[in-house]
C-alpha cells in the first residue's frame, strides 16, 4: 500500500512550479518548490516540511462516506490529514511561489514500521534535497484553529525496539508476595 500512497502524492504534487521526485527510499516522495527567482541551480535557503503518509493495517469499521476503500488498510492517526495538508500546501505554494528560497515537501512512508525515514535518509534525502531546517507536520486537535506549536530540536515521537529478559519465578495475582521479579 505505500506504493499507492506514494503514486498519489507524486501525481498530485506535480504541478507548475513544483518538481516532484518519487522513489526516495523506495516509496518516499519529495516535491521541491522554488520561490520566485530560484531554481535547482540557485535554490537559496531551503526548508523541509515533512508529513507521514503510510496506511496502517487496520480495518475501518464505520459507515462514513470517506471510509477506506482498501480492506484492512486505514490512514489512521491523522496520516490522511497530514498528507492532505501537505498536498494543499504544495498546490498553494507552487501557484504563488511568493517566497525566497526552496521548499522541500517530504512525504514520508512507513512511519509506523520504523523504516521510512531511515530508508529516505540512506537514499540520500538530504544530499539530494538539502534543508537548512525541517519541520514535521502533525495534527493537534487540542490546539486552537490557526495556531502552531513550534519547538527547536527533536520534538516528535521516536520508537525503539529492545529485547528484555526477566529472570524470576512467576506467581499468581492472588499471591504476588510469592513471585520473584
Question: Where are these predicted regions, by residue range?
Answer:
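Acidic/His- and Gly-rich active-site-bordering loop/insert found
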Residues: 1-75, 84-87, 91-99
Amino acid at each position: 500500500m505505500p506504493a499507492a500512497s506514494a503514486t498519489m502524492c507524486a501525481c498530485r504534487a506535480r504541478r507548475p512550479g513544483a518538481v516532484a521526485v518519487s522513489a526516495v527510499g523506495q516509496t518516499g516522495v519529495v516535491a521541491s518548490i522554488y520561490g520566485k527567482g530560484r531554481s535547482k541551480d540557485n535554490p537559496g535557503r531551503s526548508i523541509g516540511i515533512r508529513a507521514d503518509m503510510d496506511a496502517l493495517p487496520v480495518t475501518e469499521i464505520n459507515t462514513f462516506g470517506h471510509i477506506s476503500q482498501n480492506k484492512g488498510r486505514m490512514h489512521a492517526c491523522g496520516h490522511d490529514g497530514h498528507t492532505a495538508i501537505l498536498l494543499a500546501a504544495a498546490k498553494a505554494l507552487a501557484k504563488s511561489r511568493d517566497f525566497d528560497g526552496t521548499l522541500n515537501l517530504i512525504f514520508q512512508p512507513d512511519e509506523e514500521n520504523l523504516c521510512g525515514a531511515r530508508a529516505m535518509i540512506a537514499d540520500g534525502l538530504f544530499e539530494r534535497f538539502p534543508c537548512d531546517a525541517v519541520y514535521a507536520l502533525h495534527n493537534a486537535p487540542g490546539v486552537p484553529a490557526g495556531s502552531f506549536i513550534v519547538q527547536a530540536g527533536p520534538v516528535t515521537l521516536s520508537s525503539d525496539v529492545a529485547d528484555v529478559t526477566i529472570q524470576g519465578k512467576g506467581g499468581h495475582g492472588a499471591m504476588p508476595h510469592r513471585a520473584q521479579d
